[in-house]
Curated annotation (Swiss-Prot):
GO terms assigned for molecular function: structural constituent of ribosome
Cellular component per GO, a single term: ribosome
Cross-referenced Gene3D superfamilies: 3.10.290.70
NCBIfam families xref list: eS8
Key words of the record: Ribonucleoprotein, Ribosomal protein
Family annotation (InterPro entries): Ribosomal_eS8, Ribosomal_eS8_CS, Ribosomal_protein_eS8_arc, Ribosomal_Se8/biogenesis_NSA2
Pfam families per the UniProt record, alphabetical: Ribosomal_S8e (PF01201)
Subunit: Part of the 30S ribosomal subunit.
BP terms from Gene Ontology: translation
Organism for this UniProt entry: Methanosphaerula palustris (strain ATCC BAA-1556 / DSM 19958 / E1-9c)
Domain of life of the organism encoding this protein: Archaea
Family: Belongs to the eukaryotic ribosomal protein eS8 family.
Protein name: Small ribosomal subunit protein eS8
Encoding gene (name): rps8e
């Protein structure tokens, strides 16, 4: 579990007097770290009792071609670039903004697989 509340330490190292304790709403979760593999999703309870779908592994992506306006489900071959972290390329992690190689060519991921549960991408010309 991650606690994402405000720190009780000042920049100088002194302490703020805590006005209250920790709250359940301030707890975070570990990142999904979606990678290429047989489809696997996880349901997570979120604020208000809603459900968020996390993609843990994915095989296919919905790739849109902006010039023709056609969207197709294609197989993901590998991750070629990832500006978020160079190590994600080696580990084949899928994040928003990553450039993947598909059957149609290179595509940039536009969705957040760990938040949305799907992988939407657009072809890079």
């Amino acid at each position: 579990m991650l606690w994402q509340g405000k720190s009780i330490r000042k920049v100088t190292g002194g302490r703020y007097a805590p006005l209250r304790g920790k709250r359940r709403t301030e707890i975070g979760k570990a990142p999904a770290e979606t990678h290429i593999g047989v489809d696997r999703k996880k349901m997570v309870r979120t604020f208000g009792g809603n459900v968020k779908v996390r993609a843990l592994r994915a095989t296919f992506a919905s790739v849109a071609n902006r010039s023709t306006g056609v969207c197709k489900q294609v197989k993901i071959e590998t991750v070629e670039e990832n500006s978020a972290n160079p190590n994600y390329v080696r580990r084949n992690l899928l994040t928003k903004g990553a450039i993947i190689r598909t059957e149609l060519g290179r595509a940039r991921i536009m969705s957040r697989p760990g938040q949305d549960g799907v992988i939407n991408a657009v072809l890079v010309e």
